[in-house]
From Swiss-Prot:
<feature type="binding site">
    <location>
        <position position="130"/>
    </location>
    <ligand>
        <name>Zn(2+)</name>
    </ligand>
</feature>
<dbReference type="GO" id="GO:0008270">
    <property type="term" value="F:zinc ion binding"/>
</dbReference>
<feature type="region of interest" description="NMP">
    <location>
        <begin position="30"/>
        <end position="59"/>
    </location>
</feature>
<dbReference type="InterPro" id="IPR033690">
    <property type="entry name" value="Adenylat_kinase_CS"/>
</dbReference>
<keyword id="KW-0479">Metal-binding</keyword>
<feature type="binding site">
    <location>
        <begin position="85"/>
        <end position="88"/>
    </location>
    <ligand>
        <name>AMP</name>
    </ligand>
</feature>
<dbReference type="GO" id="GO:0005737">
    <property type="term" value="C:cytoplasm"/>
</dbReference>
<feature type="binding site">
    <location>
        <begin position="136"/>
        <end position="137"/>
    </location>
    <ligand>
        <name>ATP</name>
    </ligand>
</feature>
<feature type="binding site">
    <location>
        <begin position="57"/>
        <end position="59"/>
    </location>
    <ligand>
        <name>AMP</name>
    </ligand>
</feature>
<feature type="binding site">
    <location>
        <position position="92"/>
    </location>
    <ligand>
        <name>AMP</name>
    </ligand>
</feature>
<dbReference type="Pfam" id="PF00406">
    <property type="entry name" value="ADK"/>
</dbReference>
<feature type="binding site">
    <location>
        <position position="36"/>
    </location>
    <ligand>
        <name>AMP</name>
    </ligand>
</feature>
<dbReference type="InterPro" id="IPR027417">
    <property type="entry name" value="P-loop_NTPase"/>
</dbReference>
<feature type="binding site">
    <location>
        <begin position="10"/>
        <end position="15"/>
    </location>
    <ligand>
        <name>ATP</name>
    </ligand>
</feature>
<keyword id="KW-0545">Nucleotide biosynthesis</keyword>
<dbReference type="GO" id="GO:0044209">
    <property type="term" value="P:AMP salvage"/>
</dbReference>
<feature type="binding site">
    <location>
        <position position="127"/>
    </location>
    <ligand>
        <name>ATP</name>
    </ligand>
</feature>
Amino acid sequence: MRIILLGPPGAGKGTQAVGIVEKYNIPHISTGDIFRKNIKEGTELGKKAKEYMDQGLLVPDELTVGLVTDRISQEDCKNGFMLDGFPRNVAQGEHLDIFLKNAGISLDKVVNIEVDKSILVSRAVGRRICKSCGATYHVEFNPPKVEGVCDVCQGELYQRADDNEETVSKRIQVYLDETKPLVDYYSKQGIIADIKGDQAIDKVFEDIVAALGSGK
């Protein structure tokens, strides 16, 4: 099963990704993780990526594609993988298609988690994180038993500086401008599965599994 997971910031991709990789026994491939690993190991691609990141610049498509295709060429991806955070735009999607075609394989499904912008903003603005253990809460949807105190370790909860309405709205707009066109791109290939992400977590996962089927 070869899957791409799409969805705006705050759509719950991280939560659903855990369930997907467990159910289908495939590696979870995140571009952020790939960048960090290559930089840490000092690979040639990692060094090039670090040069851009140190300057606060976006890593060019060509370099990002190189890192991802290198990762999905590895043995543990032989029977499938789930891409999260890639492709970010249609150009990256086209590069990926060329690579997969040359490798004699194809994508099975692109899971697109859809959530209304107002809900995405509400989710992010209400998020609270434990300073000690990193547990995540939400003032409305998943509040701690005691306000401002972590249920797990009794650590102090805080709000991330970028979890404000203005910053979150900008992140969503970047997604809409850059990544949303991928939905049309994959729709034309007939492999998109639109999933309503404003439902209960279990229901969202149930819908994803129904769209993916039994796997290969």
